[in-house]
Amino acid sequence: GHLALMTLVRVRQAGLPQPALALALSPWTDTGRRGASQFGHDRYDMVQGYQTLRYGQWLKGEGPWSDAQLSPIAQDLGHLAPLYIQAGGKEILVDMIRDFAREAHRQGAQVRLDVWPDMTHEFHAYGRTLPQSEQALTALRSAMRWTQGESFEPLEETERDALDFSDGKV
C-alpha cells in the first residue's frame, strides 16, 4: 500500500498519466507515529506498532529523509487516481489509514474507504476461509469493474467514513 500510494504521487509529479484506479489494502500511510491504534491494537494484530517505526528507520537508511518525505499522508494528494482503500478495524494501521483517506478527500482526491470492524492487517490473505475476506476480494473485483463503467455499490457490513462511490465518482 505504501509503495502504491507513493508511486501515484511520483507519477503525478513526473507529469505521467494516472491509472484508472488505485487499490490500497491496509496501506502504511505514515512512517512516524499516528493514531491510538498504532500501538493500541498490538493485542489484536500480528503486525505490531513498534514494527512500523522500525520499518520507517529502515526505509530512511542513511539518507537525509524525513517522515514527511516518506509518508503518503504528508504528500500533495490532489489529482491522484481514484483511490479504493480497504482496512481492518483491529489492525494497527487503521487510524492512520482513516486519517489518510480524510486528508486525500480534503485535498480533492476521489476516495472510498471500507473498514471491516473485526479484521486485522491484510485480512484479505485468508481468502475463502473468512467471509469478510471473501467480501473484501469481491469488492476489489467490483472496484476494478467500476473502471469499465459498472456500478460499485456501498457495502453495508463495513464501517463507512462517508467517502464512497455511490454518486458515480470514487
What does each model-identified segment do?
Residues 1-170:
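Alpha/beta-hydrolase superfamily serine-hydrolase fold, recognizing
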